[in-house]
């Protein structure tokens, strides 16, 4: 006779839904990539899709920033460019997605 499987509380639960907001600087950066390099724009889109699922792990080698950027995280877009974001509760703020921590 098969044993019944008990579910642990929270097992299989979906992660909380997180809202993503873009700062005006991040919007300008995204517009730059839309016009100049669609491959980088696609990479940014993949990173932004992953952040709500895994804010502090996942693709792009996430790392916490320090000093004046304390509280923010970055992920690698390319060797030169980083996506910088902040997580506050269930809200994610994308600060920039061009250059290296301006």
Where are the language model's segments positioned?
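Enriched for short, Lys/Arg-rich terminal
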Residues: 1-19, 27-42, 46, 59, ...
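Generic structural signal for secondary-structure transition and capping sites
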Residues: 53-56, 70
């Amino acid at each position: 006779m098969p044993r019944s499987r008990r579910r642990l509380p929270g097992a299989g639960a979906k992660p909380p839904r997180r809202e993503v907001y873009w700062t005006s600087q991040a919007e300008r950066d995204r517009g730059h990539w839309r016009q100049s390099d669609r491959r980088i724009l696609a990479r940014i889109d993949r990173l932004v899709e992953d952040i709500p699922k895994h804010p502090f792990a996942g693709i792009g080698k996430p790392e916490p920033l320090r000093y004046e950027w304390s509280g923010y995280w970055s992920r690698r877009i390319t060797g030169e460019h980083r996506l910088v974001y902040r997580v506050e509760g269930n809200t994610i703020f994308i600060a920039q997605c061009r250059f290296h921590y301006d």
